[in-house]
Amino acid sequence: MRRRRTALLLVLLCLPLTACQEQQNLYSATWFDLFDTVAIVQGYADSQDSWNAQTQAMYSDLQRYNELFDIYHHYDGVINLYDVNARAAAAPVQVSDELYAFLRWCKDTAYPAANGATNIAAGAVLRLWHDARESDSPAPPDADAIAAALTHIDIEDLVLDDAAQTVYFTYPEMALDVGAVGKGYAVEQTARAAQARGLTSALLNIGGNVRAIGTKPGGKPWTAGVE
């Protein structure tokens, strides 16, 4: 008899959780103006208003990182990588908490973890390829120009001052390009912020940088196609 009562109590305790999960609906949002790619977010929420509040916050976070990591444009009121590349060889450039934390992570964590494959200091070389690609007559960059640029991609020449929160380049030819890690980092930070705001079930796909938050209602895992 006691076992039956215990089993009944467990069933009753599970009912509210199941009911809450069943009340949540699937929503989505798509943006085309972030990181030069398609950004898709889908997830479960109690209402359209709740979902809209979450996606507006996520869009704001992603847009902020998009501006911070942009090496081609300046934005009013923002010190971003465009500004750093333009000024850091002349004098240390003070940057925001977010940008400094990202650059420190790139140098101290991402670079050694990938054995140097994610070198954000390789901007001088990547710029040559970008300019060649955007030219009216696209062609591979000059070999001598590439060789010269390769002498200015040592990440140790990226000087980060924790106390002053500044960025400085040892060589004027040096440039940063965070294309290898920028979107992934932005997606991770955006997902963490969304979780802190209470989002429990979502899938972010920002140009192939995928991050799941929790599971679907009922415990089913999120799935994402890989091309």
Model regions and ranges:
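Mature catalytic core of soluble alpha/beta enzymes
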Residues: R2-L13, L17-E227
